[in-house]
Amino acid sequence: MSALVAYLCNKIILKSFQDEGLTVLVPLLEEMAKTTFAFSLKTSIIGTHFIFGCIEGIYDIFTSSKKIGKWAAVASILSHSFFGMITYLTYTKTNISFIAILVSWIFHSGWNWYVVKKL
C-alpha cells in the first residue's frame, strides 16, 4: 500500500520539482508512507521497508535499461532495507516516530542526491 501511495505521489512530485523533488520531497514522502503504514498495521518497520524496496526494484527492472535495471533493483532493495534499519534503530532509541522518519529521510535524501548528482 505504501508503494502505491508513493508511486502516485512521486509522479506528481517529479513532474513539478524534477531533481529537487527526487532529492528532497520523494524521500520524505516515501519514509512517511513506509513508516506510517508499518505503525498503522502494527507490523515490522524493517520488513515494510524491505518489501517497499522489492516493489521498487521490480519497477526498476521493468522501467530501466537492461544494463542497469538489475543493479537499480538491488540498490533499491538494499537502500530501502537500510533506511528501515535506520528508522527502527532511531525509533527504539527515541520512541518518537517523527524523529525516526526525520533521520531516515535525511539518509534517504542524501542517497538520492548522490545517485542524481554523482552517478
Model-predicted segments: where are they?
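Hydrophobic alpha-helical segments at protein termini of multi-pass membrane proteins
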Residues: 1-119
